Amino acid sequence: MLLSDLSSDQEATGSNSHGGGGGGDRMVVGSHGAAHVVLSNLFLPPAAAAAATMLLPAAPVMVRPAAMAAAQEPRAKKKRSLPGNPDPEAEVIALSPRALVATNRFVCEVCNKGFQRDQNLQLHRRGHNLPWKLRHRAAAVSAVTTAAPAPRKRVYVCPEPTCVHHDPARALGDLTGIKKHFSRKHGEKRWRCERCGKRYAVHSDWKAHVKNCGTREYRCDCGILFSRKDSLLTHRAFCDALAEESARLLAAANNSSSITTTTCNNSNISSNNNNNNINSISNSNNLLITSSSSSPPLFLPFSTTPAENPNPNQLLFLQQHQAAHHQLLLPQFQQPPSSPPAYFDHLAFGGGGGVITSSSCNDDNSSIAGDVMVAAGGDSVSFGLTSEGSVTMHAGDVGRRRLTRDFLGVDHDAGEVDELELDELPADLSTTAAACQGCNFAAATTVACCATDFTTGSRQYLGRLPPVNETWSHNF
């Protein structure tokens, strides 16, 4: 063959000249000890290629070692063992509380000095030139003499029955450890720090605390200094809660003050708007309404003027009074009361005449915001403006004189307006006042009124309320 000059190593491994390993398209066939290389199945006839594929060995399966598999698996975090898990073969020793807290368990017979451990006493005896002996460890004893049995390990249980270390399975393996445990958990705290006042039951704990107490300062945001961090944390738990409560109350106070300011501004704006609206309504409906005390009242009796009125004993004038009240102290309410016009002075005290006045009382205990009095000699009819925006009419002793109901706009008949006897007038007759949205500001507005001739029955209207129905408009 042409490729028979290949080396035996290359033939045995089945690798090509490019360094690639033996693949599925390359086969090494041995015959009588001689190796022959077939490059690829593509160069063989179909029958030979199928036979070569059947002769290929199976691919080797790599088995991962158990150590590598264990190393790659996530190792569970080892939990910390609970204190007091001794050897089952250890010797369990139960000491009394008096023996655990005793400071002079081992006493020197020379100086009567007490020690908690026997080892310390033996070392003390050396100073008195007395015989002493230290207890050797079990490992050292077993190494020297193999004949003597090794002493068992000792564990100590807590004498307190309710303690978890009272169980032998949870016994502590150190005598010093069981002594400190009993003193810390069940003993009296006899040592007190002079700086912070913290108390300790173990003297070594107290000494360690005194060395560091006062060397650091922990400052709260409120400015208080603490020498201990735990005191600062305890304080901040309450300080933060107090700060949040103070901030909430301050925010609520600010909101209430802003709402009050907005309400006052809205009241002033609404009062001005009400005055403007009332002026516009009076101009459109020929009402006698004035919002300024300095200007004289405007009379619009259809087509006549006050100078052309032939009867001087009808409605005389409108007069506005200011109510001296503690709540009406705004600048717009501090205008001086105006006097009636000069051309009505001769009619003010005329015989048989009527006077209409308006007043305001903004009293918290009263539901009437303003009233109107119609007086004719000794007879009177009063109209009250309530806070809900209605007009209440009260009839006095006016004899048999006559008033018309169309003054209030309550006549719903399409015919002629009926006249109502004053004696038959109900005590409280209320109707909604369309133009009385600003009832609290009645002192700044003159009430619309009409005039009636009480002697002859003839009527002369100086003004009227807004039309309530078609009858009101058609009757005039």
UniProtKB/Swiss-Prot annotation:
Its main location: nucleus. Residues 1-13 have a biased composition (Polar residues). Residues 228-240 are annotated as: SHR-binding. One of its GO terms (biological process) is short-day photoperiodism, flowering. A zinc finger (CCHC-type) spans 218-241. A zinc finger (C2H2-type) spans 106-128, 156-186, 191-214. One of its GO terms (cellular component) is nucleus. Zn(2+) 1 binds at C193, C196, H209, C213. It is found in: Nucleus. A motif (Nuclear localization signal 2) lies at residues 178-185. Residues 1-27 are annotated as: Disordered. Zn(2+) 2 binds at C220, C222, H235, C239. GO terms for molecular function: DNA-binding transcription factor activity; sequence-specific DNA binding; zinc ion binding. A motif (Nuclear localization signal 1) lies at residues 124-131. It holds the Pfam family zf-met. Keywords: Activator, Metal-binding, Nucleus, Repeat, Transcription, Transcription regulation, Zinc, Zinc-finger. Transcription activator that acts as a flowering master switch in both long and short days, independently of the circadian clock. Promotes flowering upstream of HD1 by up-regulating FTL1, FTL4, FTL5, FTL6, EHD1, HD3A and RFT1. Seems to repress FTL11 expression. May recognize the consensus motif 5'-TTTGTCGTAAT-3' in target gene promoters. This is Protein EARLY HEADING DATE 2. It comes from Oryza sativa subsp. indica (Rice).
